[in-house]
Design a protein with these regions (language model features):
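C-terminal capping/lid region of NAD(P)-dependent oxidoreductase domains
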Residues: 60, 65, 92-96, 111, ...
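Mid-domain Rossmann-like dinucleotide-binding core that forms the NAD(H)/NADP(H) cofactor-binding site
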Residues: 1-47, 52, 225
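Glycine-rich cofactor phosphate-binding loops and adjacent beta1-alpha1 units
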Residues: 32, 40-114
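Residues in the short beta-alpha loop(s) of Rossmann-like NAD(P)-binding domains
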Residues: 27, 97, 119, 196
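C-terminal substrate-binding/catalytic core of Rossmann-like NAD(P)-dependent dehydrogenases/reductases
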Residues: 101-164
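Short acidic-hydrophobic, aromatic-tinged amphipathic segments that line or gate anion-handling sites
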Residues: 40-46, 166-174
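Phosphate-binding active sites in nucleotide-utilizing proteins
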Residues: 218-225
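Hydrophobic alpha-helical scaffolding
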Residues: 24, 44, 71, 137-142, ...
Length: 225
């Protein structure tokens, strides 16, 4: 739910891993882009009730998982996610929505709800991010760093399309054009372009003075065996 930048990236990753993906958004242009990648588009403004659509599409089963990447104050989104989920399905909140959850909707289906914490394990851990203390791969397979590596590998392999999502390039001096209308803009991804500045770099190399070896060797022996 929510086909902005994060939603489109998420949908592509799911599709690349063999999932059937339904993308829900009110912006038809974003849905049209998602459709080119094999994602099933649904616009509640023109297509009707998304819960009924999911029920019909899944033969009455419901979604295995619902990932919310939308940003809205309404509680209706979390309610829709619960109603379109199958029994014992999973709901992951990546975006920001109202969380006045109906106990009955979650209780009757035994749904699992989780809030995603940014990039993954290691985020906000000072030892990990500042001191480079990694988590053992055998215990924590997908850390913040390994998640980024997987994304970069997916882009390199062509499984994750990012160029098509860049809708505008703005000079750094005009940054307010992006941030001033970020809530109402139809743009998906914006690039801030910095002016190229010629700089002269000086490299200083410090050479330690040559130390001549002593004429007479000194040997120390530890252990009387």
């Amino acid at each position: 739910i929510g086909m902005g930048l994060i939603g489109l990236l998420t949908a592509q990753m799911l599709k690349a891993n063999g999932c059937q993906v339904i993308g829900v958004d009110l912006d038809q242009s974003k849905l049209d882009l998602a459709k080119t990648w094999g994602i099933i588009p649904f616009n509640p403004k023109s297509d009707g009730d998304v819960v009924k659509f999911v029920e019909n599409y899944t033969n009455g089963i419901g979604c295995d998982g619902v990932i919310i990447t939308a940003s809205a104050k309404t509680d209706e989104i979390i309610s829709q996610a619960a109603r379109m989920s199958r029994k014992r399905g999973r709901i992951i909140l990546v975006g920001v929505v109202g969380l006045n959850i109906s106990r009955a909707e979650f209780y009757e289906k035994e749904l699992t709800f989780q809030v995603s914490c940014s990039y993954g394990p290691g985020r906000y851990d000072e030892n990990y991010e500042q001191r480079g203390q990694d988590y053992p791969l055998s215990f924590v397979r997908w850390t913040e760093k390994r998640n980024f590596e997987a994304i970069l590998n997916a882009i390199a392999a062509g499984n994750l399309k990012v160029k098509e999502m860049i809708t505008e390039v703005v000079g750094i001096e005009d940054y307010q054009k992006i941030y001033g209308s970020i809530g109402s803009s139809k743009s998906i991804a914006s690039i801030l372009k910095y002016n190229e500045i010629q700089r002269n770099f000086e490299v200083n190399v410090t050479i330690n003075p040559y130390i001549k070896a002593a004429a007479k060797a000194n040997i120390g022996i530890i252990g009387a065996g």
